[in-house]
């Protein structure tokens, strides 16, 4: 008896997911494999992927255009949360996984599948994100992960696929593992596994080398409503267009690269290279606008929420009670986060040089040192006395 009768497989067209199709059928006794490829704005033509899946033995090959949903329901939530894993990574790849899990579950329910499958290996984060996402959305579905169990090397995996007529034009000169969507690219493996090796320039596609960037700065203005980016340079844009255009202009100036050692869910450290030009600038601009419109106690408390939120996304807990509760808190804080942030782009830097909001709680008359100063200076002495009273009592008892 096979492990499942009908399986919906998350499919990218790469070596592992292509080999998963005959492996599921011939090694694990699956009767039917349906593949699902998600279009998340990665820019690839998915028609050939459909044909490849059918050639590999799938009974049906699905392509879901979920780019708009990806930006609106996933990326924009992360922007409101200023989500940066370990203070650096804007989760451009991690954010795609709960959406793909959702698409897999929906397809399984629609086509009557009793299992879903993915091609993730045992050392990566994505296996956790897919497994937990699917579990949270439909705990009755089996989750199959052939690449986690088959114990084949890369060469053996390719040889297995070739037995079933699959062709893999793998280039030995390109040993990198790359993932891309509208929000950015992630690059790992190969020579990058040596943390002292400088990444070769050719791995970057969304961001220019500093030597190739314009010699004059460029200014952009991003408009926000309730914490969401809605306009670029005064022009209201739909979410996908805004991200796409901002990627181009920011990347042109060499902004948006990350080279970091990160702590994976499974307990190992990994060297990762990311490109996420628009997402990084949007988070920075959003955080700056919050500093203008939120009270200090909310701003400081929200920082802890943001760190927890980032960890939930990274660790596969998008569909969790805590994540939903944090969303409610974050949404409430964003009611007055409206306004415009001005950014100067030049030679790899994105510097915020201005911000304005009708809901600003910055008061020039209180902040100024000029003649228009309205601050009550006499109140400072009494404030300091009360504020420092615990310190005074402690000092008198211990130093006197």
Swiss-Prot record:
It catalyses: L-citrulline + L-aspartate + ATP = 2-(N(omega)-L-arginino)succinate + AMP + diphosphate + H(+). L-aspartate binds at residues 121, 125-126. PROSITE patterns: ARGININOSUCCIN_SYN_1, ARGININOSUCCIN_SYN_2. Its EC number is 6.3.4.5. One of its GO terms (molecular function) is ATP binding. The keyword Amino-acid biosynthesis applies. CDD domains: ASS. InterPro entries: Arginosuc_syn_C, Arginosuc_syn_N, Arginosuc_synth, Arginosuc_synth_CS, Arginosuc_synth_type_1_subfam, AS_cat/multimer_dom_body, Rossmann-like_a/b/a_fold. L-citrulline binds at residues 89, 125, 129, 177, 186, 262, 274. ATP binds at residues 10-18, 38, 119. It is an enzyme of class 6 (ligase). GO terms for biological process: argininosuccinate metabolic process; L-arginine biosynthetic process; urea cycle. Pathway: Amino-acid biosynthesis; L-arginine biosynthesis; L-arginine from L-ornithine and carbamoyl phosphate: step 2/3. One of its GO terms (cellular component) is cytoplasm. The keyword Kinase does not apply. Disulfide bonds: none annotated. Pfam families: Arginosuc_syn_C, Arginosuc_synth. It is found in: Cytoplasm. Keywords: Amino-acid biosynthesis, Arginine biosynthesis, ATP-binding, Cytoplasm, Ligase, Nucleotide-binding. Homotetramer. HAMAP family: Arg_succ_synth_type1 (MF_00005). Belongs to the argininosuccinate synthase family. Type 1 subfamily. PANTHER family: ARGININOSUCCINATE SYNTHASE (PTHR11587:SF2). This is Argininosuccinate synthase. The gene is argG.
């Amino acid at each position: 008896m096979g492990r499942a009768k009908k399986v919906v497989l998350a499919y990218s067209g790469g070596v592992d997911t292509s080999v998963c199709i005959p492996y599921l059928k011939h090694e694990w006794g699956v009767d039917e494999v349906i593949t699902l490829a998600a279009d998340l704005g990665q820019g690839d033509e998915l028609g050939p992927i459909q044909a490849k899946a059918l050639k590999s033995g799938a009974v049906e090959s699905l392509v879901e255009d979920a780019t708009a949903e990806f930006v609106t329901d996933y990326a924009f939530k992360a922007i409101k949360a200023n989500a940066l894993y370990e203070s650096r990574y804007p989760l451009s790849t991690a954010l795609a996984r709960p959406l793909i899990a959702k698409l897999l579950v929906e397809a399984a329910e629609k086509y009557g599948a009793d299992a879903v499958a993915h091609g993730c290996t045992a050392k990566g984060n994505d296996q956790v994100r897919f497994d937990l996402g699917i579990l949270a959305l439909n705990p009755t579905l089996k989750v199959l992960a052939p690449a986690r169990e088959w114990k084949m090397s890369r060469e053996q995996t390719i040889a297995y696929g070739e037995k079933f007529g699959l062709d893999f034009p793998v280039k030995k000169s390109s040993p990198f593992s790359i993932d891309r969507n509208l929000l950015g690219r992630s690059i790992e493996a190969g020579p990058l596994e040596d943390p002292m090796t400088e990444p070769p320039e050719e791995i970057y596609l969304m961001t220019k080398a500093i030597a190739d960037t314009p010699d004059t700065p460029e200014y952009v203005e991003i408009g926000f409503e309730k914490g969401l980016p809605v306009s670029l340079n005064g022009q209201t844009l739909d979410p996908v267009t805004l991200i796409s255009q901002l990627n181009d202009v920011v990347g042109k100036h060499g902004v948006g690269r990350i080279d970091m050692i990160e702590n994976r869910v499974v307990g190992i450290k990994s060297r990762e290279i990311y490109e996420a030009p628009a997402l990084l600038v949007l988070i920075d601009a959003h955080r700056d606008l919050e500093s203008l419109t939120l009270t200090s106690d909310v701003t400081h408390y929200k920082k802890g929420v943001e760190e927890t939120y980032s960890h939930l996304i990274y660790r596969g807990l998008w569909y969790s009670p805590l994540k939903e509760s944090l969303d409610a808190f974050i949404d409430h804080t964003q009611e007055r986060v409206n306004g415009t942030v001005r950014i100067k782009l030049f030679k790899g830097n994105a510097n915020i040089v201005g911000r304005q909001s009708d809901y600003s709680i910055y008061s020039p008359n209180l902040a100024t040192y000029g003649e228009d100063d309205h601050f009550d200076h006499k109140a400072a002495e009494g404030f300091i006395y009360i504020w420092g009273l615990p310190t005074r009592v402690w000092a008198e008892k211990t130093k006197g």
